[in-house]
Amino acid sequence: DGKEKNKILDHASYSFEKGKIYAVVGASGSGKTTTLSLASGLDKPDEGRVLFKGKDIQEIGLNKYRREDISIVFQSYNLIYYMNALENVMSALEIAGIKRKDKKEYCLSILEQLGLSKDECKRDIRQLSGGQQQRVAIARAIAREFDLILCAEQTGNLDAKNSLDIMNTFLDLAN
């Protein structure tokens, strides 16, 4: 097409160990979102490949990879707005076909770990603050017990204390 592309990432290589937490940090425009988009399969690299457990994600199949192996929590939370917080988290299990006898209690415990009260869990999503909605989105990812959870600005709408609480919850879950 004659247009020259800007290189955002050049010869980037990352390896991650199970049970560890990593942060992609950098200045605005440094490639953080691009890195997450590539790792999630939302974008395809111009060169090279993205491996997950030693297999190219293109060969795994992007639908299978995104449905079974990873969860993505971006700045837009993709919550179901006609449900309350608890129903949103339980729906993530239903969509994945995960059956649990203790589904309600399990999802409620995750939401409570992330700082939502039982009353807040019963509230319509639109009645929750941006930070509370963010915690619901994170709870949806945690509930599915994915091998890899990718978060972009996962603490961006939270104050310093709640941000630290979220990071500590991720650390607890990783251990």
Regions found by a protein language model. Give the residues of each.
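The feature captures the beta-strand-to-loop junction immediately N-terminal to the Walker
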Residues: 25-27
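Conserved ABC ATPase signature
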Residues: 124-128, 132-134
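Conserved ABC ATPase "signature" region
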Residues: 101-119
